[in-house]
Amino acid sequence: MAVSDFALQLKTETKKSHTAAENTKFVSSFLRGVVSKDSYKQLVANFYFVYRAMEEEFEKHKNHPVLGELHNEALNRVNNLERDLRYYYGPIWRHHIKPTEQCQRYVNRIREVSEDDPELLVGHHYTRYMGDLSGGQILKNIAEKSLNLRDGEGLWFYEFEGIEDKKAFKAVSYTHL
């Protein structure tokens, strides 16, 4: 299976942004294992808002010739994020969370792109989901150790129950780009 030229271009073109993201104060601290439970809880809450928007927009475009082929429900994160949010905030977690201003801008952009030029969602899909299947697994291990989490609780976001072989799944996904 050949990786598409577009997939290679995405990887190349997002490299600088990826490096810049890794060098933000929060991410660089996180990568060193310096993360507070409060900041991690907010990260999980922000992820919830982002992935809820992504999954709602991909559902709207499930019959789209490009997006319908790209998104696989095994990637969906919302249910796992809800489980994590119950762990961190309790059963009425919805009353305790709100997106940060930056997160809300990102969610607005996802919805705007979906409405105006849905094929641009491909870039968001690549950045979020493929990143979760790759570096996200490293972040899971760091969070587990830093926050002293046990038995996977609070880390369900990183679990992809419907994907047995992440590497093979990514390889197939890259051919759809």
Model-based region annotation:
Residues 1-6, 29-39, 119, 152-160:
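Short, charged, low-complexity loops and linkers
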Residues 24-41, 52-72:
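Helix-loop segments that flank and shape redox-cofactor active sites
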Residues 2-27, 167-171:
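Acidic, low-complexity proline/glycine-rich segments
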Residues 11-12, 69-168:
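Active-site-proximal alpha-helical scaffolds that flank and shape metal-associated catalytic sites
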Residues 175-176:
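Conserved small/polar residues in nucleotide/adenosyl-binding loops
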Residues 20-23, 50-57, 135, 139, ...:
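Amphipathic, well-ordered alpha-helical segments in soluble domains
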Residues 18, 51, 55-58, 82-85, ...:
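A structural signal for well-ordered alpha-helices, especially hydrophobic packing surfaces
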